[in-house]
């Protein structure tokens, strides 16, 4: 599926990228699961080296090894071996004092499970280094409750550190009309209503219907309720992510 909408968000991220050539930027991007944050971030990156890192719920040592490999591949920088994400982040901030690049931590809130001291360490490193840094740091997260606490709670170490905030919203009905017009120009009002009711404008759900070529009301219902449907376990997965598994 081609990239739709998000013109304002794309322009904003590209402006921030340009600003990072002279001053460090910390951008926080929030929005519900499957809304298209990662796709937007990748789409908006244009001119400088781009490091994308998904913060999985793994051991800190393993995450460090994965990130150092990505840094070596992207920047050609040999960082050695780390078992502390704080020390690795400090090394990356030092590199950013001589090189401009984008660093994305996707599902940033997961660091709370990896090492709950990381946020305090990050605040200290950022405060000491940012004035000489040219990093374009993007911190993306799907769990609004945790992301809001990390960045909006005055008691939290990263409170007030973000230089930019973006909250990604679902596609509007006009964008859904555009998508339907591109893929199924003869759509009816009932088709559009079903398309909206099932997806809610969530980019991943829209993409799934496009992949299934489900554009009529009848085909949309079959795609959602049919055997092996992507949507069958989605509600449970969303609740598990937000509130934890039993």
Report residues per predicted region:
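Phosphate-binding site recognition
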Residues: 1-246
């Amino acid at each position: 599926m081609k990239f739709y909408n998000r013109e304002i968000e794309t322009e904003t991220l590209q402006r921030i990228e340009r600003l990072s050539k002279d001053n460090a930027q910390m951008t926080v991007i929030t929005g519900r699961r499957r809304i298209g944050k990662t796709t937007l971030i990748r789409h908006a990156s244009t001119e400088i080296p781009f490091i994308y890192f998904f913060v999985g719920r793994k051991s800190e040592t393993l995450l460090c090894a994965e990130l150092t490999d990505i840094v070596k591949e992207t920047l050609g920088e040999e960082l050695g071996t780390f078992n502390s994400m704080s020390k690795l982040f400090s090394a990356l901030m030092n590199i950013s004092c001589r090189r401009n690049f984008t660093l994305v931590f996707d599902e940033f809130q997961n660091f709370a499970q990896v090492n709950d001291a990381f946020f305090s360490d990050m605040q200290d490193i950022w405060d000491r280094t940012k004035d000489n840094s040219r990093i374009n740091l993007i911190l993306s997260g799907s769990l609004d409750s945790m992301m809001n606490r990390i960045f909006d709670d005055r008691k939290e170490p990263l409170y007030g550190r973000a230089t930019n905030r973006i909250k990604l919203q679902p596609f509007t009905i006009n964008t859904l009309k555009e998508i339907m017009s591109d893929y199924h120009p003869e759509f009816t009002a009932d088709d559009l209503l079903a398309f909206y009711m099932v997806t809610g404008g969530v980019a991943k759900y829209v993409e799934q219907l496009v992949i299934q070529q489900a554009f009529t009301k009848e085909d949309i219902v079959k795609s959602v309720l049919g055997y092996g449907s992507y949507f069958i376990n989605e509600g449970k997965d969303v609740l598990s992510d937000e509130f934890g598994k039993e």
